[in-house]
Amino acid sequence: MELIGHGHSCIEIRLNDGTNLLFDPFINGNPLADVSLADLHPDYILITHGHSDHIGDMLAIAQANKATIIAIAEVAMYAQSQGVKAHGMNLGGRYVFPFGSVKFVPALHSSGYEIDGVMTYMGEASGIILEAEDKKIYHAGDTALFSDMRLFAKDKSIDVAFLPIGDNYTMGPEDALEAIAYLNPEITIPIHYNTFPVIQQNPAIFVEQVVGGKVLNPGETILV
């Protein structure tokens, strides 16, 4: 499979069977984004939580591609109310899709989205574990460090972990290193940094401290 970075927490995954998955599609308004909405053609859009820098352009992209949104129940219900296909899930739940399985796991964070000028609760924040093509991928979304992360690798080791390092809104580099000790992934890719002034970090310094650490700059691809 191919892992492609699009800045912030937006990750595109192209599976060998041709299925295209897109996580947290924050493109418009993202100064790091390397693509336009017209460049993206996902079959499924996976959303970790309801903040605007993660929901991003999910509706426009889903409508243009007839994609199915996979998200926490409240985010999925909002998407359905806007006329797009969505599959709602919740923490601890796992579902087998044609491309593989998706499990929603806890994240320590908040989740709300402004609708018609009102901040609306959008369910629990989550991380997402994808298992496809004999690979296990963990996208942590936005989260603080918590010790139960070690459970995510209990049954099967994690091949790739996408972990936020920006600090301020999420865990910073020090806590992300502790998370790696819990998760023990083969590859760790930092996300959620340098998009805003308060989350400035040097990813190169971070990955130097990590066995299997890799920086996935916008537009770059990693094969796993």
Curated annotation (Swiss-Prot):
Give the organism's phylogenetic lineage: Bacteria, Bacillati, Bacillota, Bacilli, Lactobacillales
Q: Which InterPro entries match?
A: Metallo-B-lactamas (IPR001279), RibonucZ/Hydroxyglut_hydro (IPR036866), UPF0173 (IPR022877), UPF0173_UPF0282_UlaG_hydrolase (IPR050114)
The family this protein is said to belong to: Belongs to the UPF0173 family.
Pfam families in the cross-refs: Lactamase_B_2
Species annotation: Enterococcus faecalis (strain ATCC 700802 / V583)
Tell me the GO molecular function terms.
Answer: hydrolase activity
Keywords recorded for this protein, A-Z: Hydrolase
Give the protein name, as stated in the record.
UPF0173 metal-dependent hydrolase EF_1371
